[in-house]
Amino acid sequence: MTQLKNPVLMATIGAAQGLRGEVRVKSFTDDPAALGDYGNLHSEDGRVFEVLEIREAKNVVVVRFRGINDRTAAEALNGLELFIERDNLPDDDLDEDEFFYADLEGLEAVDRTGKSYGSVTGVFDFGAGDLLELKGPGLRPVLIPFTEWSVLEIDLEAGKLVIDPTAAGLVDDEKSGPGKPFPTKRK
């Protein structure tokens, strides 16, 4: 994706809908019907898509793109991911403590002592809550829960987020580590 400097995934194209070139699209925007409000959408292979029509359907939006005029052309788009440039996202609508998930990528994850656990390489939602992927030099990627207990502070200007490594599952709690599920009380 050479055209975009800081791409943000906005949608994934699904199956064709009807005969006029419409496609079912899974939009990752707050308002799925506003997908076209962010400007042209770009694919990883460099194609540009302009939204002509959009309407809501069950769990998706149905979109007609410029230049996609028949079912065959629409079917060829199945599975295609669509991106915009990060600068096209409206920052002025955000509160002070709000951010876009795309802004988290690249932040260094540190604990309160400053020890680094790598940087954020992705944000995922597999249905049970958001997860941050951390990757450090020479380390395998790990997923940590994106919760208020695991991520204590986010500082976009400093380029870091402060985590609790125990709550994030990166280190064992000395009191209740493996083989010791609960601290025992002695009489």
From Swiss-Prot:
Cross-referenced Pfam families, in alphabetical order?
PRC, RimM
Q: Which domain of life is it from?
A: Bacteria
Q: Where in the cell is it found?
A: Cytoplasm
Signal peptide per UniProt: none
Q: What GO molecular-function term can you cite, just one?
A: ribosome binding
Q: Which residue numbers delimit the PRC barrel domain?
A: 96-169
Q: Which UniProt keywords apply?
A: Chaperone, Cytoplasm, Ribosome biogenesis, rRNA processing
Among the GO biological process terms of this entry, one is:
rRNA processing
InterPro entries found in the cross-reference section? PRC-brl_dom, PRC_barrel-like_sf, RimM, RimM_N, RimM_N_sf, Transl_B-barrel_sf
Its GO CC terms are: cytoplasm; ribosome
PANTHER family in the record, alphabetically?
RIBOSOME MATURATION FACTOR RIMM
What interactions and quaternary structure are annotated? Binds ribosomal protein uS19.
The UniProt comment on domains reads:
The PRC barrel domain binds ribosomal protein uS19.
Q: What does this protein do?
A: An accessory protein needed during the final step in the assembly of 30S ribosomal subunit, possibly for assembly of the head region. Essential for efficient processing of 16S rRNA. May be needed both before and after RbfA during the maturation of 16S rRNA. It has affinity for free ribosomal 30S subunits but not for 70S ribosomes.
Similarity section: Belongs to the RimM family.
Q: What is this protein called?
A: Ribosome maturation factor RimM
